[in-house]
Amino acid sequence: MLRQSKGKFLLKSEALLEEFIWLHLKPLLNLDPVKKQYFINKQNRSDILGVNPEGRLAILELKKGEGKGSIDQLLRYQDFFGKESHQDPNFERVDFSKKFLLIAIASYFNSSTIDYARKMISDCLLLTHEVKQYDNGEYFLVLKKLDNRILSKISIEIIEDSLMII
């Protein structure tokens, strides 16, 4: 299910975006899935947790619109995982002594959010997402770096205004 915003195709809900990225973590970001919607406390839960081949925990925060709130969320989750011990078997491949990968994915980031991210988390990966239709009619979820270079993309199939994952 798609919507159009500022001339871009986007998934209609954050839940669809999250599910699609979760199911395609490896081809999109070279991460293995660890946990989705991990409860930090009653008010906070991390969207997606993954682990890279070196055992670093990746904390992903997704926004269907502007990524303004994602930086503070990533900071809270980084603090939580840095302090807590995790006996959950989902975390067995994670080396908590290694620096975490913090990734914010949104349809766009305004300049103040980008400046704030660079100040607070110098190595935070800020990625934009969009669904792009190519000339051959195929749709792809595209993740781009801030300089507009494509980091990764993966095919999706749209049938009768619905999203079919392939």
Residues covered by each model-derived region:
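Charged, terminal alpha-helix-loop-beta segments
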Residues: 1-166
